Amino acid sequence: MSTLNKYKTLIIISSLAAVSSCSWFSAKDGTEDIDDRYMKSQQDLELQVPPNVKQIEVQDRYRVPEGVIITNRNAKGKALSLDPPQLLLVGGDGVREDSEQSHPTVWVRHQDTPFMNYVSRFMMQKNIPVISSTEKQISSDWISDEDEDIFSQYIGSYNLDGQRHKVTLEIIGQNANEVAVQARNTQSQRLVDDKWVTMNTSKTVASQFLNAFLGFYDTERTKEARERILEEGTINVSLGTNSQGQIALIAERDLIAIWEHLPSVLEDLNLSVSDRDQSAGIYYFNVKEPETGFWAWLWGNDETNAKVDMEPGDYQIHLAATTYGVSMTFKDEEGNLLDSNLVTKIYPEFAASFKSRGK
């Protein structure tokens, strides 16, 4: 054992012994810490209401005008659905629920490949029978819990035996960066006395079907991103300027590749991603306070400290396509450009991390 380790061990043992001895010398029955003054308190005068104050009168000031037809009332009593609640898989990056829709709907971030290609591949991979398909909609035939295919376990598992369902996936909205996907349980039947009897459709069945697709979509996108990174190889980063002439890091790669690569680079530099906005091309990250003091010196653990020389706080990285590739412009929490000297200082660490990530 080295001399330094012996000193560290001796300091730890001495500290523990000192704390134990202090607690033993000060030990009492604990009554000195009890404040029992409340037991001696006396009741004061009752609250006096001023003479000009009248009794509060509760009135319905928001009456519905006569002749108004009320629609879309929330279900009550027996009209409530007996289906168990089913949450949508919106925890992943780029997926958000559209709660204003009457059927389970999510907005999925998507820009390149036609989205319906993933829907068709999903139906094919899961061996789901298809009865109709268009550029924006695909509908299944009956999916039964008695099907041999494992996909039948994804829907109706909470229901009685002998049920079958038809489900439709449809693109109901689209913008530059997102696609709105909706799932509907169009038909449901139950087997009663060897006859199929129509039953109420279920939002839970639709949600489970949509969740199955979202899981497939996320897996496929992750696989494609990994293959793209392996094919593209090393990412070279240089110091340059963006399209506005501001100092920035320049990567000779397409925007999607850098966007997908940047989280692993920040993690490698011990910089935590706090948020992201792909539509605006912005990553938000945080530089934590370095661990200092006696215990940090004692254990000598610098693995969690930031590997770049930046002040603790919140920062932004703005990505934009340029003639030569992608520019990465660094800004502070308020959106102000970082000093060019600071960007020059942190450039080598970012360049080295990008290069190692691409191998």
From Swiss-Prot:
Protein location: Cell outer membrane
Lipid-acceptor residues (N-palmitoyl cysteine): 22
Database matches in Gene3D superfamilies: Outer membrane protein assembly factor BamC
Signal sequence extent: 1-21
Residue positions bearing lipid (S-diacylglycerol cysteine): 22
Cellular component aspect of the GO annotation: cell outer membrane
Membrane topology category: Lipid-anchor
Keywords: Cell outer membrane, Lipoprotein, Membrane, Palmitate, Signal
An individual GO BP term: Gram-negative-bacterium-type cell outer membrane assembly
Cross-referenced InterPro entries: BamC, BamC_C, NlpB/DapX
Main location per the UniProt record: membrane
Bilayer-crossing regions: none
Annotated function: Part of the outer membrane protein assembly complex, which is involved in assembly and insertion of beta-barrel proteins into the outer membrane.
Family: Belongs to the BamC family.
Subunit structure of this chain's protein: Part of the Bam complex.
Protein name (record): Outer membrane protein assembly factor BamC
